[in-house]
From Swiss-Prot:
NADP(+) binds at G129, S130, G131, G132, A133, L228, G251. It comes from Prochlorococcus marinus (strain MIT 9515). Its EC number is 1.1.1.25. This is Shikimate dehydrogenase (NADP(+)). Involved in the biosynthesis of the chorismate, which leads to the biosynthesis of aromatic amino acids. Catalyzes the reversible NADPH linked reduction of 3-dehydroshikimate (DHSA) to yield shikimate (SA). Belongs to the shikimate dehydrogenase family. Keywords: Amino-acid biosynthesis, Aromatic amino acid biosynthesis, NADP, Oxidoreductase. It comes from the Bacteria. Homodimer. GO terms for molecular function: NADP binding; shikimate 3-dehydrogenase (NADP+) activity. It catalyses: shikimate + NADP(+) = 3-dehydroshikimate + NADPH + H(+). Coiled coil: none annotated. One of its GO terms (cellular component) is cytosol. The gene is aroE.
Length: 285
């Protein structure tokens, strides 16, 4: 029951109407018997500082931060975790006792979650896309001790940024999606991760495959293919790779695992029920 004493957690971004976070977070909150509620708050670019600082004065305990604010909230935090500093992205804020925000990033642990029991040490990986999501993926693959990462992208500037950021941590290279060597790379890689929005329900490319179907005809059936998109599930890309005999992973487990880690962060280490969150999403979708 919501009362005047009920605290709240919120997702801040633009847009947030498509987010499934309130569904899974409120299911976990109810299961744990917490006097909390989780809501999504749309925020314009120019209003970010006002909104985030105003929430300090309300009964807000923590925030999730999504596109396009994961870097912009740095200046609003008095404390930032080393991992968030490293990848230059914050997705979770917690209000400290001194009424200032502490920022961290749970996307990396979320990304790793479905890969933890696979032996990827010294394996090679291809990452599709060089946007913000690629940073968490690269750090996750470093943590899993892969030996080499190749990023395929349409944007040379963002490719170079990522290589500069991570070149001291792992063997990493970037190539443009027009490179003739892509077919050979795909044939030889162990893990492919799609971080692009191609295939997402809300995009005009919702029936498309990253860089075109012809790029993937040579994919080996032993390759693991991981698409960060969770709606639709599976994506056209995963359907294609599944028909090729590949092991496929969608973005649902990452979504839940990063959300569970955020809720644990807000509640000082409380064990959060993954399955309860998963069942809530499954029922909704």
């Amino acid at each position: 029951m919501i009362t005047s004493n009920t605290s709240f957690l919120a997702l801040i971004g633009n847009p947030v109407s498509h987010s499934l976070s309130p569904i899974m977070q409120n299911a976990a909150i109810k299961y744990l018997g917490l006097d909390l509620i989780y809501i999504a708050i749309p925020c314009k670019n120019e209003d970010l500082e006002i909104v985030v600082n105003s929430l300090k004065k309300m009964n807000c305990k923590g925030l999730n931060i999504t596109i396009p604010f994961k870097k912009k909230v740095f200046d609003l935090c008095s404390e930032i975790s080393p991992v968030a500093k490293k990848i230059q992205a914050i997705n979770t804020l917690k209000l400290k006792n001194d009424n200032n925000w502490s920022g961290t990033n749970t996307d990396i642990e979320g990304f790793i979650y479905p890969l933890k029991n696979l032996n990827l040490t010294n394996k090679n990986s291809i990452i599709l896309g060089s946007g913000g999501a690629a940073r968490s993926v690269i750090q996750g693959l470093i943590d899993l001790k892969l030996s080499k990462i190749t990023i395929i992208s349409r944007n040379n500037n963002s490719l170079n940024e990522l290589i500069t950021l991570f070149k001291n941590d792992i063997k990493i290279e970037g190539i443009l999606n027009t490179n003739d060597e892509i077919g050979n790379l795909i044939e030889e890689t162990d893990l492919i991760v799609n971080t692009t929005p191609i295939g997402m329900s809300q995009t005009s490319d919702n029936d498309a495959i990253p860089f075109g179907q012809s790029s993937w005809e040579t994919i080996d059936s032993n390759t693991i293919v991981y698409d960060l998109i969770y709606n639709p599930s599976p994506t056209p890309f995963l359907k294609f790779c599944d028909r090729k005999g590949c092991m496929t992973i969608d973005g649902t487990q990452m979504l839940i695992a990063q959300g569970a880690k955020s809720l644990s962060f807000w509640t000082n280490g409380l064990e959060v029920p993954f399955e309860v969150m998963h069942d809530a999403l499954k029922k909704y979708l």
